[in-house]
Amino acid sequence: MTAILERRESTSLWGRFCNWITSTENRLYIGWFGVLMIPTLLTATSVFIIAFIAAPPVDIDGIREPVSGSLLYGNNIISGAIIPTSAAIGLHFYPIWEAASVDEWLYNGGPYELIVLHFLLGVACYMGREWELSFRLGMRPWIAVAYSAPVAAATAVFLIYPIGQGSFSDGMPLGISGTFNFMIVFQAEHNILMHPFHMLGVAGVFGGSLFSAMHGSLVTSSLIRETTENESANEGYKFGQEEETYNIVAAHGYFGRLIFQYASFNNSRSLHFFLAAWPVVGIWFTALGISTMAFNLNGFNFNQSVVDSQGRVINTWADIINRANLGMEVMHERNAHNFPLDLAAVEVPAING
């Protein structure tokens, strides 16, 4: 005789709330991470939209020279940005109630800190929610692991780098041109193009794009025909079908002959693991590189490393990059730095006379 024991359903309001939060039958899964994710991302998104449209100029360098970033103050979609919190605030926690007035809070770039901190909490909770839903559905946890790469990258540029540099004013502005400015200044100050971790990140992103295109084109080119010439090949697939939709043997044979045999995967599972792991590991390394350069452990310096027998410098591309770095450094924050650090550190030659 088989006895079926049913769990007694809680009748309390809290019990029903818990069941609803953790139910996988909802159209959108909420989960306990979602309880924190939803308000933080809504807050970050709302403040970003309002500030991008209407925030007044921000004194980013702390020298009473405000920089305009919003649409209503003369910017467009490309030039507009949420200006980072002022250097006068540094790394201080700067909520609205810490300012003497809302005007002061806006002038010192308070919205940037508010948006960034809520955003980072939100995306971290989104990652946790991915794990939570996978766990409840009996799936493996690799979706959340893959998402940890962009979370690590965002944390590096919005939090770790400002901490290492001593001010949120060094964080990445929230806009298109602001992002480019951040990249240029980062190169000038840290020589990121000569950092091996950044090189691994470039290989991860470009390699991931290449492998994705190769995989998609191979699969699309080796579909098992289920339709006539007058129908789209896509109509030959039915959602949930058990049989394969493409011929992996044909794809393997094609690619093995195109390059060489062992360049082609004969295991679909290891292939898809590779497609996921390659860009994820690359972006992990980039985030780690940003986090180390935050504390001024910079890219390689090969300046003036090649000389002739007379001691004269033979320029290499490293010297060309160094010259570009100096030019970018003297141009950024031009009113905040009377003497850029790299130039001010050069010893003045003695004059005999």
From Swiss-Prot:
Residues noted as binding chlorophyll a ChlzD1 in the record, renumbered to the chain: 118
Chain residues that bind pheophytin a: 126
Cofactor note: The D1/D2 heterodimer binds P680, chlorophylls that are the primary electron donor of PSII, and subsequent electron acceptors. It shares a non-heme iron and each subunit binds pheophytin, quinone, additional chlorophylls, carotenoids and lipids. D1 provides most of the ligands for the Mn4-Ca-O5 cluster of the oxygen-evolving complex (OEC). There is also a Cl(-1) ion associated with D1 and D2, which is required for oxygen evolution. The PSII complex binds additional chlorophylls, carotenoids and specific lipids.
Topology within the bilayer: Multi-pass membrane protein
Prodomain residues: 345-353
Any single GO BP term: photosynthetic electron transport in photosystem II
Chain residues that bind a quinone: 215, 264-265
The organism's place on the tree of life at top rank: Eukaryota
Keyword Acetylation among UniProt keywords: yes
Maturation and modification: Tyr-161 forms a radical intermediate that is referred to as redox-active TyrZ, YZ or Y-Z. C-terminally processed by CTPA; processing is essential to allow assembly of the oxygen-evolving complex and thus photosynthetic growth.
Protein localization: Plastid, Chloroplast thylakoid membrane
Keyword Transport: yes
Gene Ontology terms: cellular component: chloroplast thylakoid membrane; photosystem II
Pfam family, one: Photo_RC
Record: residues binding [CaMn4O5] cluster: 170, 189, 332-333, 342, 344
Site entry (Tyrosine radical intermediate), positions: 161
Binding positions for chlorophyll a PD1 per the UniProt entry: 198
Site positions (Cleavage): 344-345
Transmembrane segments: 29-46, 118-133, 142-156, 197-218, 274-288
Keyword field: Acetylation, Calcium, Chlorophyll, Chloroplast, Chromophore, Electron transport, Herbicide resistance, Iron, Magnesium, Manganese, Membrane, Metal-binding, Oxidoreductase, Phosphoprotein, Photosynthesis, Photosystem II, Plastid, Thylakoid, Transmembrane, Transmembrane helix, Transport
Reactions performed catalytically: 2 a plastoquinone + 4 hnu + 2 H2O = 2 a plastoquinol + O2
Family according to the record: Belongs to the reaction center PufL/M/PsbA/D family.
Self-association and partners: PSII is composed of 1 copy each of membrane proteins PsbA, PsbB, PsbC, PsbD, PsbE, PsbF, PsbH, PsbI, PsbJ, PsbK, PsbL, PsbM, PsbT, PsbX, PsbY, PsbZ, Psb30/Ycf12, at least 3 peripheral proteins of the oxygen-evolving complex and a large number of cofactors. It forms dimeric complexes.
Note: 2 of the reaction center chlorophylls (ChlD1 and ChlD2) are entirely coordinated by water. Herbicides such as atrazine, BNT, diuron or ioxynil bind in the Q(B) binding site and block subsequent electron transfer.
Listed HAMAP family: PSII_PsbA_D1
Record's protein name: Photosystem II protein D1
Species per Swiss-Prot/TrEMBL record: Hordeum vulgare (Barley)
Lineage: Eukaryota, Viridiplantae, Streptophyta, Embryophyta, Tracheophyta
